[in-house]
Curated annotation (Swiss-Prot):
Isopentenyl diphosphate binds at residues 47, 80, 130, 229-231, 273. Keywords: 4Fe-4S, Iron, Iron-sulfur, Isoprene biosynthesis, Metal-binding, Oxidoreductase. It catalyses: isopentenyl diphosphate + 2 oxidized [2Fe-2S]-[ferredoxin] + H2O = (2E)-4-hydroxy-3-methylbut-2-enyl diphosphate + 2 reduced [2Fe-2S]-[ferredoxin] + 2 H(+); dimethylallyl diphosphate + 2 oxidized [2Fe-2S]-[ferredoxin] + H2O = (2E)-4-hydroxy-3-methylbut-2-enyl diphosphate + 2 reduced [2Fe-2S]-[ferredoxin] + 2 H(+). Binds 1 [4Fe-4S] cluster per subunit. It comes from Phenylobacterium zucineum (strain HLK1). This is 4-hydroxy-3-methylbut-2-enyl diphosphate reductase. The keyword 4Fe-4S applies. Its EC number is 1.17.7.4. Belongs to the IspH family.
Length: 314
């Protein structure tokens, strides 16, 4: 039997689930335990196909709009946050609802409301159509928030009063891209009000930094995450910028060994909504084909946890 070729695998750390994702999944699981199935979930609880399929098997029913859920069953709002109109509609229907919005997304909602109450014109840096952006813009009256996606958008933005502008951001953006947009806004509007603490969340930042640390040494980077996961897509982009050929895959089945022909070092990471079992699946598949030397590249320690809603605590 021919010997397997050697392959160094650099495993990014931190990777995978963040505290907000962990909390959101627990909310659905505990709601099913407490209230029985079905429990309805408005939008995918987190953007990962494997997580969604597992929760479906437990008794979760995923819908895109609240009117697709019956009045007499619990409904959970996804980790990405929802416009104010959604809980208002649930209350008017006397529905039992549980809000799994990540507390760090809720922080952005509070900031946006504070700026609005202070009479500032608000800029949201984010990706059009992403549920988090829809939810943040939906905290305020229509037209109160201007969405900016690029430096070009920042240069074209024309506020009513250049001295009275504030910005907030989506939590799952590219740290580097966002810094460029913020720099452009600050250059144009020196008095622009900024978040007290950066809106891009600790987990997004840490995972991007971990990718930078391994992608500079790896020829190929494999990112585990679904294509609709903003933070996972950003990890692949960060890897490419750092010089690696980066591929975003759902699971080990998506691994193409032609990517690894002539490759000595591969980096592996997972987006904040991707379970660790998917990483292990890739490592197992690599070990079938290669003599793997595994190195964990630890760039940060995460100790953040978030409390469950009172209705499910204990």
């Amino acid at each position: 039997m021919p010997s397997r070729p050697p392959l160094t695998v650099l495993l990014a750390s931190p990777r995978g689930f963040c505290a907000g994702v962990d909390r959101a999944i627990q909310i659905v699981e505990r709601a099913i335990e407490k209230y029985g199935a079905p429990v309805y979930v408005r939008h995918e609880i987190v953007h990962n196909r494997h997580v969604v399929e597992r929760l479906k098997a437990l008794g979760a029913v995923f819908v895109e709009e609240l009117d697709q859920a019956p009045d007499d069953r619990p409904v959970v709002f996804s980790a990405h946050g929802v416009p104010k109109s959604v809980p208002a509609a649930a209350k008017s229907r006397r529905m039992l609802y549980l809000d799994a919005t990540c507390p760090l997304v809720s922080k952005v909602h509070v900031e946006a409301q504070r700026h609005f109450d202070a009479g500032r014109e608000i800029v949201l840096i984010g990706h059009a159509g992403h549920p988090e952006v829809v939810g943040t813009m939906g905290q305020l009256p229509e037209g109160a928030v201007a969405l900016i996606e690029t430096v070009a958008d920042a240069m074209a933005f024309q506020p009513r009063d250049p001295a009275n502008v504030a910005f907030v951001t989506q939590t799952t953006l590219s740290v580097d891209d966002t810094a460029e947009i913020v720099e452009a806004l600050r250059a144009r509007f020196p008095a622009i009000a900024a978040p007290h603490k950066e809106d891009i969340c600790y987990a997004t930042t840490n995972r991007q930094e971990a990718v930078k640390a391994i992608a500079a040494k790896a020829q190929v980077l494999v990112v585990l995450g679904s294509a609709n996961s903003s933070n996972s897509v950003r990890l692949a982009e960060v890897g490419r910028r750092a010089g690696a050929r980066a591929y975003l895959i759902d699971d080990a089945e998506g691994l193409d060994f032609t990517w690894l022909e002539g490759v000595e070092t591969v980096g592996v990471t997972a987006g904040a909504s991707a379970p660790e079992v998917l990483v292990q699946g890739v490592l197992d598949r690599l070990a079938e084909r290669f003599e793997v030397t595994l190195t964990e590249a630890d760039t940060a320690r995460e100790t953040v946890t978030f409390k469950l809603p009172r209705a499910l605590a204990g």
